[in-house]
From Swiss-Prot:
The gene is rpmA. Belongs to the bacterial ribosomal protein bL27 family. HAMAP family: Ribosomal_bL27 (MF_00539). Residues 1-21 are annotated as: Disordered. PANTHER family: LARGE RIBOSOMAL SUBUNIT PROTEIN BL27M, RIBOSOMAL PROTEIN L27. One of its GO terms (molecular function) is structural constituent of ribosome. GO terms for cellular component: cytosolic large ribosomal subunit. PROSITE patterns: RIBOSOMAL_L27. GO terms for biological process: translation. Keywords: Ribonucleoprotein, Ribosomal protein. This is Large ribosomal subunit protein bL27.
């Protein structure tokens, strides 16, 4: 293998694409079932009531309702408070 760089080459220029992590729905917002609430690596936020956790630790709403952030046994958690459905 060459140990000299050669004309106009560089050892830099590698970077990963942004992963678009973070909170997607904030406290007080209304969501439908299945909507993504938080994209994360690891469990920065834990699933609370009516919230599921995907294989990549993504939190999503299990029911339609209002998003609420709070503490669950000393950990940050996200819950969804179901909204009563008006009967037609």
């Amino acid at each position: 293998m060459a140990h000299k760089k050669g004309a106009s080459s560089s050892r830099n220029g590698r970077d990963s694409n942004a992963k678009r992590l973070g909170v997607k729905r904030f406290g007080g917002q209304y969501v439908k079932a299945g909507e993504i609430l938080v994209r994360q690596r690891g469990t920065r936020f834990h699933p609370g009531d009516n919230v599921g956790r995907g294989g990549d630790d993504t939190l999503f709403a299990l029911v339609a309702g209002r998003v609420e952030f709070g503490n669950l046994r000393g950990r940050k958690a996200v819950s969804v408070i179901p909204t009563p459905v008006a009967s037609e």
